[in-house]
Amino acid sequence: MANTSSAKKATRKIARRTEVNKARRSRVRTFVRQVEEAIASGDATLAKEAFLAAQPELARAATKGVLHANTASRKVSRLAKRVKALSAPTA
């Protein structure tokens, strides 16, 4: 239990930041899920649109410290690879 006023304030700040970060993380997951659903449906144009919407969300989460920069980069890279494979002609 926090005893000093500064520790109590820090606890309040942490609670507020946690709520903001939860919302951001949820938003990122939603965008990534939309891309994965579009890929699963096999619609290349829908997948590309969803990917283009998800990319800045992942970058924003990395900038804000919700995701590690390398994690966001890895997710973007893997999604891009899957979207590209979907639109590529099958040989």
Swiss-Prot record:
One GO term (biological process): translation
GO CC term, one of those recorded: small ribosomal subunit
Residue numbers spanned by region Disordered: 1-23
Gene3D superfamilies (alphabetical): Ribosomal protein S20
UniProt entry tagged with the keyword Isomerase: no
UniProt entry keywords in alphabetical sequence: Ribonucleoprotein, Ribosomal protein, RNA-binding, rRNA-binding
Coiled-coil zones: none
GO molecular function, one term: structural constituent of ribosome
Pfam families reported in the protein's UniProt record: Ribosomal_S20p
Family: Belongs to the bacterial ribosomal protein bS20 family.
Function according to Swiss-Prot or TrEMBL: Binds directly to 16S ribosomal RNA.
Record NCBIfam families: S20
Record-given protein name: Small ribosomal subunit protein bS20
Gene assigned in the entry: rpsT
